[in-house]
């Protein structure tokens, strides 16, 4: 099974349990780091901070279900956490949600002589996002985005 399909299947299995516990699933990833596999889920609650106890509640519920369903054949570590203040933006839903907020966007390759841009996310279109930086609107094609993060406010 391809990784993308596995992640989609895992999201379909995990999202209802996360929701049942009173949280939203922000993002899920299955990665290999230093010869170890990790299933990472990032959870949130609208207008509330995520505590260690929140992560524990979701982790226990997911662990029980994953032991029964056994969707991952390799040994792996389950990690549940908050996406944090400087959360990664992965989808159009994430970008749209944070229009008007400060973001940092790194590019896969140079764009108009720049490697990245930091500014206010102004708009999200089908194939690009628009970031206002120092009074200029910079159009960033989505296929040029290497990483995008919300710049958290404390």
Curated annotation (Swiss-Prot):
Highest rank taxon of the organism: Bacteria
Biological-process GO terms, alphabetical: ribosomal small subunit assembly; translation
Keyword Lipid biosynthesis applies: no
Zinc among keywords: no
Cell compartment(s), UniProt: Cytoplasm
Keywords, ordered alphabetically: Cytoplasm, Ribosome biogenesis
UniProt similarity note: Belongs to the RimP family.
PANTHER family reported in the protein's UniProt record: RIBOSOME MATURATION FACTOR RIMP
Protein's recorded name: Ribosome maturation factor RimP
Organism of provenance: Clostridium perfringens (strain 13 / Type A)
Main location: cytoplasm
Lineage: Bacteria, Bacillati, Bacillota, Clostridia, Eubacteriales
Gene3D superfamilies: Ribosome maturation factor RimP, C-terminal domain, RimP-like superfamily, N-terminal
Function in brief: Required for maturation of 30S ribosomal subunits.
GO cellular component labels: cytosol
């Amino acid at each position: 099974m391809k990784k993308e399909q596995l992640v989609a299947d895992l999201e379909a299995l995990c999202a209802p349990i996360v929701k049942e516990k009173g949280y939203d699933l922000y993002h899920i990833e299955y990665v290999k780091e230093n010869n170890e596999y990790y299933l990472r889920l990032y959870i949130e609650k609208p207008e509330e901070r995520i505590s260690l106890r929140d992560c524990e509640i979701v982790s226990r519920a997911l662990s029980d279900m994953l032991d029964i369903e056994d969707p991952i054949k390799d040994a792996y570590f389950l990690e549940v956490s908050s996406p944090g203040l400087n959360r990664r933006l992965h989808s159009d839903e994430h970008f749209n949600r944070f229009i008007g907020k400060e973001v940092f966007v790194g590019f896969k390759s140079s764009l108009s002589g720049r490697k990245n841009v930091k500014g206010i996310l102004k708009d999200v279109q089908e194939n690009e996002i628009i970031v206002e930086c120092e009074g200029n609107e910079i159009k960033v094609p989505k296929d040029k985005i290497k990483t995008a993060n919300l710049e958290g406010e404390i």
